[in-house]
A protein has these predicted regions:
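Active-site-proximal alpha-helical element of nucleotidyl cyclase-like catalytic domains
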Residues: 22-41, 76-78
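A short linear hydrophobic-aromatic micro-motif
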Residues: 41-47
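A short glycine-enriched loop-to-beta-strand structural element that forms part of the catalytic core
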Residues: 47-55, 84-107
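Short amphipathic alpha-helices in soluble, non-transmembrane regions
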Residues: 69-75
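Helix N-cap motif at beta-to-alpha junctions
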Residues: 61-66
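Catalytic/regulatory signature loops of cyclic-dinucleotide turnover enzymes
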Residues: 111-132
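Active-site-flanking beta-strand signature of metal-NTP-handling nucleotidyl enzymes
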Residues: 3-15
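Short catalytic/binding micro-motifs of nucleotide second-messenger systems
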Residues: 76-84, 119
Length: 140
């Protein structure tokens, strides 16, 4: 059976913030996605976080595998946010299958990044392009 791409969307139902404003959500999300990937063997190709949730692109054998990954992420979010005194009462998980067309995957990743930046009030055009020399030293 060939592996397929899935997009997993986890979002608070009541549109409340997923994390408190003084909490480093980016580091937390990287931690829980890496942990879920290690526990389930599912490869995640990228994620985008929003004030009210997150979306991930996964590389799975089946929808069941994608669901296991999503459940692991959801459990980690609930346990961690509960421990810092910010309980998420309800959030929904949606799993959708992508095609194997890499352009589709790239388009989805770009869309996720754009929406994530927009949620933070950033403009795609305002992000500077970084240039590096042959030794990896930052030029600008």
């Amino acid at each position: 059976m060939s592996k397929r791409h899935y997009i997993v969307s986890i979002k608070t139902i009541d549109d409340k913030l997923l994390f408190p404003t003084d909490f480093n959500g980016e580091a937390f999300l990287f931690g829980v996605t890496a942990k879920a990937s290690a526990k389930t063997g599912v490869i995640f190709k990228g994620y985008s976080s929003f004030p009210t949730g997150l979306e991930l692109v996964l590389y799975c054998k089946s929808g069941q595998e994608a669901r296991m990954f999503a459940d692991e992420i959801a459990n980690s979010i609930y346990i961690k946010t509960n421990s810092i005194g910010h309980i998420i009462h309800s959030f929904g998980i949606h799993i959708g299958e992508l095609t194997n067309d890499e352009r589709t995957l790239e388009a989805v990743m770009m869309d996720m990044m754009t929406r994530s930046m927009a949620a933070r009030g950033l403009d795609m055009e305002s992000i500077p392009t970084l240039s590096f020399d042959a030794d990896g030293k930052l030029l600008n």
